[in-house]
Amino acid sequence: FLPLVTGLLSGLL
């Protein structure tokens, strides 16, 4: 779950 969230955040940033 964490890796997915970090991936989304990095994508948004």
Curated annotation (Swiss-Prot):
What does the sequence similarity comment in the record state about its family? Belongs to the frog skin active peptide (FSAP) family. Temporin subfamily.
Q: Which domain of life is it from?
A: Eukaryota
Residues with Leucine amide modification: L13
Q: What is its main location?
A: secreted
Alphabetic keyword roster? Amidation, Amphibian defense peptide, Antibiotic, Antimicrobial, Immunity, Innate immunity, Membrane, Secreted, Target cell membrane, Target membrane
User: What is this protein's tissue specificity according to the annotation?
Assistant: Expressed by the skin glands.
Q: Spell out the protein name for this chain.
A: Temporin-1CSc
List the GO cellular component terms: extracellular region; membrane; other organism cell membrane
What the protein does comes down to:
Antibacterial peptide. Has activity against the Gram-positive bacterium S.aureus (MIC=64 uM) and the Gram-negative bacterium E.coli (MIC>128 uM). Has no hemolytic activity (LC(50)>300 uM).
Q: Which GO terms describe its biological process?
A: defense response to bacterium; innate immune response
Q: Where in the cell is it found?
A: Secreted; Target cell membrane
| Record has Membrane as a keyword | yes
